[in-house]
Amino acid sequence: MKESFYIEGMTCTACSSGIERSLGRKSFVKKIEVNLLNKSANIEFDENQTNLDEIFKLIEKLGYSPKKTLTKEKKEFFSPNVKLALAVVFMLFVVYLSMGAMLSPSLLPESLLTINNHSNFLNACLQLIGALIVMHLGRDFYIQGFKALWHRQPNMSSLIAIGTSAALISSLWQLYFVYTNQWSYGHYYFESVCVILMFVMVGKRIENVSKDKALDAMQALMKNTPKTALKMQNNQQIEVLVDSIVVGDILKVLPGSAIAVDGEIIEGEGELDESMLSGEALPVYKKVGDKVFSGTFNSHTSFLMKATQNNKNSTLSQIIEMIHNAQSSKAEISRLADKVSSVFVPSVIAIAILAFVVWLIIAPKPDFWWNFGIALEVFVSVLVISCPCALGLATPMSILVANQKASSLGLFFKDAKSLEKARLVNTIVFDKTGTLTNGKPVVKSVHSKIELLELLSLASSIEKSSEHVIAKGVVEYAKERNAPLKEMSEIKVKTGFGISAKVDYQGAKEIIKVGNSEFFNPINTLEIEENGILVFVGRAISEKEDELLGVFVLEDLPKKGVKEHIAQIKDLGINTLLLSGDNRENVKKCTLELGIDDYISNAKPQDKLNKIKELKEKGQIVMMVGDGLNDAPSLAMSDVAVVMAKGSDVSVQAADIVSFNNDIKSVYSAIKLSQATIKNIKENLFWAFCYNSVFIPLACGVLYKANIMLSPAIAGLAMSLSSVSVVLNSQRLRNFKIKDH
């Protein structure tokens, strides 16, 4: 059984990887992925051994709060920005008290300047008050950090909590000696506590703002979903809930309103804003017979539409589900960071303790408290400067921003692995009709051995039951010439060949067949000299003999810009192959015209499937680009499946990438975005590993002989900057652009 839910209380990748590691050890858990950024978890488990409630209990034992839905954050008295501002104010107050005299004696009043028990104690008490206020403002670090430590799942908050608490306790200890007149003054770390917390809070705030902006893509789409729609019933408008709409309902769409579910216009016309699908800002003109999609907006004029999907299966629902899955899933490249994070925090705590002991022993002065002070500073610096956040943010932040960028390009990735794998593709297999071409073949000529209107009537009656684009071309042609439709029975579809049905022909019920040449065993011939898509119409005389009645010649022109985009793809060193069920002449012509490397014509669904298998067996990483029902098996077999927007539901389910702008440029964009994303992730990981590899030894004091020691305050600043640098580098993907060929 597969389940998705949310986990609250996670602060860094040590949290998410700890949950994965703990549950992954259970025999009944087959697979688990926890995403830190959107707090989601996907788990696959054996329902015969456990249930979701038991899994929730296991997660709660680790110190986290699993929930089926995210709860709204409780409104606090201070907003995050106000809390941050107050932390900065009180931090400056404490720094002023602790360091003002060193900077300039005139900065402090005389009562706090003289070094004697009374003035030093008063100064320290004021620092303590300021530090406690800052700690209260940053209390989440202590609540989450010590909670995680108690459950033996230490995280970033644990490092901050231990380090600042150690500094506070040491300061309180020294303050006690001053208060009891055993010491004349103490060496306090109140300003270090404040500066560390302030820097960490600033870093976290920047992280959260950036994360929220990246997550806005799905939130914006969800806002496009109307709660109600106008349903026509007995010639009256009735406002109904969108969830109650069923296929076949007639809906009225008013100007300025969103389309509730997918459907087809049956009366009127409109201009629709489909930018949430295609990324294109210009409105799209729609008329009777055109499809409309949920979540798009009607600019002006009202129209009637017939629902072809319910809310659950609508285009918008599928997009939201894809974005959620993409944001919740993990790329393979993140596994390295997860493995390191699983031992990172415990290792840092061990290193900090070891460094403390070593410095306590080898510190250069014989004074114990002097040595203790140096050792404590090293201990706190090591804990604070270590940054599992930079490591944990490296991959998911880039994936999050990349998915947001993809949606603006009309692209949607099924999961992070699809985004990661697209860059590795070295062979692309294209379907022709509707993928490279406009997908709307038009009849350019008809050759008939019977009365033309009768042929049109027979063909359109049978083809009307098909969703194939070629069939629609025939139906449209017949409709324009007012050919009457006939009643049918015993409809049979032979996938990849054609359709047959019993139809009234010359006063008798005859089996009429409509399809390609291989669908027939003709006893007669039709001389056709022109090239194009041939659709034959015939009468079945027996099981093995057919009489040809006529043929439609259609043409499907290539989409605008396809040739240039295929050239861009080939410039990446990728092999291209056209795999089509069309005849050899048409496929060859299309291949030469568009500059595709090779082609296979007259390919049936099984032929396409076999070719994909063959390419994969040769070690090729294959991307299949298609849009029709016949493509579904091949799409599922390919390494990366790309579906053009208006494909059938079956094809969309098999897709790794969906292009809602129905443009081959999307294929090139997906590959380039994949390359840019992985490059960005590698930059983030390189920085995160280098940062920790360099700064942890520095915090330990390895360059003490060169008079280089990092104070806890500087360590806090460095830690915050490391996370912020990863976030800012990930944001560079927002500026990703596709260069025109």
Give the residues covered by each predicted segment.
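Flexible metal-binding regulatory segments at protein termini and peripheral loops
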Residues: 1-122, 236, 316-317, 321-329, ...
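Conserved ATP-binding TGD loop and adjacent catalytic N/P-domain core of P-type ATPases
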Residues: 17, 38, 505-510, 541-683
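Transmembrane helix-loop-helix hairpins at the membrane interface
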Residues: 78-228, 339, 446, 464, ...
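Hydrophobic alpha-helical transmembrane segments
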Residues: 131-141, 148-151, 158, 165, ...
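P-type ATPase nucleotide-binding
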Residues: 443-574, 584, 596-611
